[in-house]
């Protein structure tokens, strides 16, 4: 379709390469640690997301209407550590597991400690609401947005 509009191949390639979708494999640097935000909230998305990493520290939050067990089945095998957090109003709480944090930012801060020790990134996922809550603070100047 873009070719039909007369766009040059180089412009199409550059656009695809530089495209960004907030909350989808979005990368930040926070206190020297790479933090990835991704709203993966179903098993196929979680499977695709997990393939992008060899290991990570996981911050996870979800809503009861989602296939949480299916999502975690793909994410947990590569998680060096896990922190569960409330994704938003009506989201799952402590029943997700422990350690559980009401405030996702506190879960992220806690995950940073482990990440600084081993150099692995932090991956926050499971809900676009969780990602949105974290992203709001990161783009407010607390973290550096990376390409």
Residue ranges and their predicted role:
Residues 53, 115, 138-142:
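Active-site catalytic pocket residues across diverse enzymes, especially alpha/beta-hydrolases
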Residues 130-132:
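Short, active-site-adjacent cap segments at secondary-structure transitions
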Residues 7, 16, 20-23, 74, ...:
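Flexible, gly/pro- and Lys/Arg-enriched active-site loops
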Residues 1-81:
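Nucleotide phosphate-binding/pyrophosphate-handling subdomain across enzymes
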Residues 3, 34-35, 67-123:
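C-terminal helical cap/extension that packs against the catalytic core
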